[in-house]
C-alpha cells in the first residue's frame, strides 16, 4: 500500500479557530486556546498519522498588523510557513465579514503559488444563507482548490476536511514516528499551559505582556513527582501585582489550573512552582524575545 504524506499550514487572522481545529484533529490539546486575540505566538506542529498517511499540520500565529517586535516575529513566523508546506488551509470565520486583514493574507497567498483550501469556520453561529453569502464573497477574491465549511468547536465537517487533505496528498515518507504528535519539547508545552491560564484569568493589556519560561523540570525520586519551576515574565510592576493577586491568590489559581493540564499531558503527578518577574518592554527587545523562545530560527 502506498504511503502518503505532506505538510499543511493553517493560516488566518487572530481568533478564527485555528488552534481549536488542530486540537480537534489531534484528539488532544497541543495548542493553547483562549478568547484573546494573538494567543498563538509560535508555530505549533501537529502530527496526524494513520497506517496510510501522515499529515503534518502547522498552526500559525494569527496574522495582524504588528505593533511590537514580538508582533513582527509572529507575523513573519506565520508567513514563513508558505515556503515549507504542500497545502494551505486559509481559515475565516463564518460570522464576520471579510476585512482588510483577510485581503492582506489573500494577496500573500496569491503570490505563494501553493494550493489553498478555504476553511469557513464557526458555521454553528450563522444561518445557512449568511454562510452562502460569505462563501461567495471569498470565492470572488481568488481561486481556491476547495471550500470547506466547518465548526472546529463542535467537530462538524472536520473529518471531511481531513479526508480532502488526504485525497490530495502525494506519495511520501513518514517523517515522524507514529506515536509523535508534535515537534515541540515538553518544556515548551508546559510553558504554554501556564500562559494559557494567565490568558484566561487576566484582562486588558496583561495577556499580551506575558511570557513564561520553564527554569527547571525534573523528577523527584522520593515523591515520584515531576518538579517544575516556571517564571511568568511581565513588563510592569503593576502587572506583577495583578498576577500575584491579593495574598498570592491569583498566582495560586494560575498554578493550580495549569498543574492539572500538565499532569494530563505528562501522565504524571506534578509539583509546580511559579514566580513572577518584571522585564520592562521585553516585547520590543530581540535578546529578550530570543531568551523567551521567540527567535528567528523558527523561520
Swiss-Prot record:
It is found in: Cytoplasm; Cell membrane. Residues 121-124 are annotated as: G4. Residues 38-42 are annotated as: G2. Residues 59-62 are annotated as: G3. GO terms for molecular function: GTP binding; GTPase activity; ribosomal small subunit binding; small ribosomal subunit rRNA binding. Pfam families: KH_2, MMR_HSR1. The keyword RNA-binding applies. Its main location: cytoplasm. An essential GTPase that binds both GDP and GTP, with rapid nucleotide exchange. Plays a role in 16S rRNA processing and 30S ribosomal subunit biogenesis and possibly also in cell cycle regulation and energy metabolism. Belongs to the TRAFAC class TrmE-Era-EngA-EngB-Septin-like GTPase superfamily. Era GTPase family. This is GTPase Era. The lineage of its organism: Bacteria, Bacillati, Bacillota, Bacilli, Lactobacillales. The gene is era.
